[in-house]
């Protein structure tokens, strides 16, 4: 199948023969929802992808659950975002600055990436402060409550990668699938 927007699909490369429409659940899941996954489920995913021993995220999954309960932001989606943005907690900025989300690591000068005192601090800051602009309808960065795509959601302003939202959604699905689909369509 072929698609120009990630949800309208065609059977031919010229995109003349319509096949159907599909919306990825995790790509459009509002961040103001609560995940049913536990810290163990998140850690199991990290172990399963081979980063249980070399990731700064390892042993810190509870930070995402605690911040979800404190700020009302979906722990699964933020964990998936951290996995994508930090190469599962193994990137240079993750390991040297506890920056799991690429804050201030702009394309033109990634070395201005923010530093945090630790993973809990980074997660707290991300879920409690940084995402607020994307979730606040009065903020200029607000284009929807989900990771979305370049048409709506965080992906409009958060990342230059056109497929950023679907990449995070794919990781979220993989995490949830390994945990027994505790969140899908709930």
Predicted segments with their positions:
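Catalytic cores of secreted/periplasmic lytic hydrolases that degrade extracellular macromolecules
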Residues: 1-77, 88-186
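C-type cytochrome heme c attachment motif
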Residues: 80
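Pyridoxal 5′-phosphate
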Residues: 85
């Amino acid at each position: 199948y072929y698609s120009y927007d990630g949800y309208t699909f065609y059977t031919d490369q010229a995109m003349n023969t319509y096949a159907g429409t599909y919306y990825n659940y995790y790509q459009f899941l509002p961040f103001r929802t609560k995940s049913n996954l536990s810290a163990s489920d998140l850690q199991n995913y990290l172990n399963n992808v081979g980063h249980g021993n070399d990731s700064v995220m390892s042993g810190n999954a509870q930070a995402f659950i605690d911040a979800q309960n404190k700020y009302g932001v979906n722990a699964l989606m933020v964990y998936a975002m951290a996995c994508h943005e930090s190469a599962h907690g193994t990137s240079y900025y993750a390991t040297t600055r506890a920056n799991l989300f690429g804050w201030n690591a702009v394309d033109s000068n990634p070395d201005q990436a923010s530093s945090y005192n630790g993973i809990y601090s980074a997660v707290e800051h991300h879920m409690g402060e940084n995402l607020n602009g994307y979730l606040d309808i009065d903020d200029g960065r607000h284009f929807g409550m989900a990771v979305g795509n370049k048409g709506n959601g965080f992906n409009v302003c958060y990342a230059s990668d056109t497929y950023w939202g679907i990449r995070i959604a794919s990781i979220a699905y993989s995490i949830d699938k390994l945990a027994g689909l505790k969140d899908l369509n709930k």
